[in-house]
Amino acid sequence: MKFGNFLLTYQPPQFSQTEVMKWLVKLGRISEECGFDTVWLLEHHFTEFGLLGNPYVAAAYLLGATKKLNVGTAAIVLPTAHPVRQLEEVNLLDQMSKGRFRFGICRGLYNKDFRVFGTDMNNSRALMECWYKLIRNGMTEGYMEADNEHIKFHKVKVLPTAYSQGGAPIYVVAESASTTEWAAQHGLPMILSWIINTNDKKAQIELYNEVAQEYGHDIHNIDHCLSYITSVDHDSMKAKEICRNFLGHWYDSYVNATTIFDDSDKTKGYDFNKGQWRDFVLKGHKNTNRRVDYSYEINPVGTPQECIDIIQTDIDATGISNICCGFEANGTVDEIISSMKLFQSDVMPFLKEKQQFSYYIS
């Protein structure tokens, strides 16, 4: 089993940006002490939904502040920045940390990012594929060049080269079927969403495995991650109530982030994400409190045993043994750390990998 910690860097209304940044550093260090394998940093722009416009910089700080902890991005919006510049940053982190950096990528969800950074969001799928191939080749070859409809530049060395053999490990935040299929074609591990239930997670892994095998990948050694909003307390109601105010503001902040520009919903290629929201509303979850209650049904929020039951059910359904939690909904930094430590002592030791049964005929 492996355990990760998502550091959201959401700014609640009652806290300053300076306080959120202090939390980031402290929680990163505490994560290492609590036995977490990796902390994950999210890229967001122009919104208090997440204060990290450049996760590479934050990753560099946390890698320098820790000794064994891996630090990853979950995720870099790959199409919105030049691929050479991105690989330079990834390789630098890979070298300076001696292989402790994890390169999580995504296609991007927010129209605002593409518009401000001058990238056509309607081309996000094609750009994701093009940028990924350039970066992957650059990791192994040590140079990059491009001459296609999306980008043109002459052959250049990418320095420093990668420290890790084959380059820093790459992960994909995958929410739609199309992104799941894309990740499977390339044999890349997925970070699964915390907003889907066990059946959806199982179906996503089954789709991935089917496609990955068609492309010749060994599906038994792919380090997929299950992600969760997490709050652990011996009092179940206390765990739920302490998260409610944070999650309510956080959800509202997410909605605001997706609609900074009035015509954001006209972008092509995001029908799954729009449909997911429509389905959510049809199920009666438009009310913020109902959305929070539904989140409690599918995330480890409650007593240690309740948390174990929810996570173990997903492990058994998917076979995934890399568990990534976000604890920031727990209130103050001291309350967050208390929940992390209780998770370490009363949840981590009792989660088990899915048992693989073999049958022999004698």
Curated annotation (Swiss-Prot):
Q: Which InterPro entries match?
A: Alkanal_monooxygenase, Bact_Lucif_Oxidored, Bacterial_luciferase_CS, Luciferase-like_dom, Luciferase-like_sf, Luciferase_bac/NFP
List its EC numbers.
Answer: 1.14.14.3
Q: Which GO terms describe its cellular component?
A: cytosol
Q: Describe the reaction catalysed, as an equation.
A: a long-chain fatty aldehyde + FMNH2 + O2 = a long-chain fatty acid + hnu + FMN + H2O + 2 H(+)
Biological processes annotated in GO: bioluminescence
Keyword Nucleus found: no
Q: Which PROSITE patterns match?
A: BACTERIAL_LUCIFERASE
Q: Which domain of life is it from?
A: Bacteria
The record, for CDD domains, names: Alkanal_monooxygenase
Which Pfam families would you find in this protein's record?
Bac_luciferase (PF00296)
User: Which principal EC class is assigned to this enzyme?
Assistant: oxidoreductase
Q: Which GO terms describe its molecular function?
A: alkanal monooxygenase (FMN-linked) activity
For this UniProt record, the keywords arranged alphabetically read as follows: Flavoprotein, FMN, Luminescence, Monooxygenase, Oxidoreductase, Photoprotein
Subunit structure, briefly? Heterodimer of an alpha and a beta chain.
Q: What else is known?
A: The synthesis of this protein is regulated by a complex control mechanism that has been termed autoinduction.
Q: What is the similarity comment for this entry?
A: Belongs to the bacterial luciferase oxidoreductase family.
What is the stated purpose of this protein? Light-emitting reaction in luminous bacteria.
Protein name (database record) = Alkanal monooxygenase alpha chain
Q: What phylogenetic lineage does the species belong to?
A: Bacteria, Pseudomonadati, Pseudomonadota, Gammaproteobacteria, Enterobacterales
